[in-house]
Amino acid sequence: MRALVLQSYGGREAVALTDVPAPTAGAGEVLIRTRAVGLNPVDAMHREGDFKAIAPDDFPTVAGNELSGIVETVGAGVTAFAPGDAVITRVDPSGHGAFAELAAVRADWVAAAPARVPLTDAAGLPLAGLTAQQALGPEHLDLQPGERLLITGAAGGVGLIATRLAHLRGAHVTVTASAAGEPYVREAGADAVIDYRTRTVAEGGERFDKVFDLIGGDQMAELLGSIEPGGRLVTIAGPPSPGSLRETARPSRRPLAAVVSRVASAKVRRAAKKAGVAYEFFLMHPDGVGLAELVRLVDAGELAVTVDSRYPLADWEQAFERLESHHAKGKVLLEF
């Protein structure tokens, strides 16, 4: 089967479109013939080796995190799906494997694809959707009706879905986005937009109950200062908090991951404590039940999968160039 294979860490030159052996469905798994895959910032980070200290790869390896496709076969014990079913999934975070014509995935990580959008476009839902859903949910921000939420960098895949889900929860949603991104976040349900190119969050003087940060970087102190005491900041881009890397790290690297997370986040955790704010970095986990709920919202017309661009597999380099430009409004998809 054809696959995008990561041959070493590096830039796009480290990736090759080549033939590799096809996987088979083990017990409790489904084998999916890929229709399309979603590209995500974490894919570029993986390629560059950002996680190699705690989760080193054995090269060559097939990367990729999410896909849509048609069930080819099912393994022993699988009753929820059958050959021919249209499905979407977030694949194993430790094994990856989405960037291939066939992928074997645990059945409990899979959901029936939404009927309301093309199967190709549905590939953009799993990772961004589950990240937003879990961040806003009871395990993390626990967003409640009427609360004031800030989402930074909201015009991308995760941000647009998070904006919509927060709006559906009855929160007052402020986002940061460029002028070009404002129409997208407004359509998703943003109540207020801060153009980060013309003013900072602090300059606006707004106060928030909770913040969902998608940017990271040197703005963290400013964000903490904008949150009411007793509030929360959850990030997928800031320094990792203690325990947050455990499931990502290989077992032999978990002691190192624990040290890295404590040291890397020490400064921001001190600042958060001083501000009376809870700080947390988190990584989403595959969840077929949660994914099915997102599909329900899509089919009900309450949630959209915003697609920035679609590329054929042969143009994978251009697809990654678009992703890494940081100008995509919504998802960049690669069609198989």
Each language-model region and where it sits:
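Glycine-rich beta-strand-centered segment in the early N-terminal region that forms part
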Residues: 21-39, 51-96, 214
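NAD(P)H dinucleotide-binding glycine-rich loop of Rossmann-like/cofactor-binding domains
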Residues: 56, 65, 80, 89-153
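Residue-level marker of beta-strand positions
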Residues: 85-86, 102, 148, 168, ...
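N-terminal Rossmann-like NAD(P) cofactor-binding module of classical short-chain dehydrogenase/reductase
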Residues: 88, 194, 211-212, 234
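Mid-domain Rossmann-like dinucleotide-binding core that forms the NAD(H)/NADP(H) cofactor-binding site
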Residues: 125, 129-198
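A short acidic, Gly/Pro-enriched loop at the edge of an enzyme's catalytic core
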Residues: 202-210
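Glycine-rich phosphate-binding loop and adjacent beta-alpha segment
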Residues: 219-300, 336
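C-terminal hydrophobic helical "lid"/dimerization subdomain
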Residues: 284-336
